[in-house]
């Protein structure tokens, strides 16, 4: 699942701050893992806290919430990195 060449973010995917995606509340399964949406949580070891995903909202939506894609940001500014 991609938008403009960017792969969807799934539970367990990493961030450029060394963190990872903790939750993925959509019912969409991409290559065996749930896809993450706006508001799903990440953990940032640099900031030592959990932060919500804040996608740009230009891609597909699930029940009104935008999916997160490679390069989207978290509330602390970390970039999401897809494993797809």
Model region roles, listed by residue range:
Residues 1-84:
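Intrinsically disordered, low-complexity proline/glycine-rich segments
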